Amino acid sequence: MTLIEAQEGQEYTIQQIQTNDEELNSFLFSLGCYSGEKITVVSRKKSNCVISIKEARYSIDSQLAQAIVV
């Protein structure tokens, strides 16, 4: 499932990043978002998700959330 389908407050392990866009993949990697890393959806607001990775919080749009498979 992708982060769009993930439940708020539950910790997941990232299985893969599904994108052919190298810039998007590089951006997610710079956030610490890569296979094997733990991730939590903190909250959702319309088209954005607030996620927690490595004790840091980020707001990402639905396109980024759709690329993250947990």
Regions found by a protein language model. Give the residues of each.
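Intrinsically disordered, low-complexity, charged/polar segments
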Residues: 2-5, 66
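Conserved hydrophobic positions within beta-strands
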Residues: 14, 39-41
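Short, acidic/hydrophobic/Gly-rich beta-strand patch recurrent on exposed beta strands
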Residues: 14-16, 30-32, 50-52
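Short, conserved catalytic or interaction motifs in soluble domains
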Residues: 19
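Short alpha-helix capping/helix-loop boundary micro-motifs
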Residues: 23-27
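C-terminal structural segments of small proteins and small subunits
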Residues: 41-70
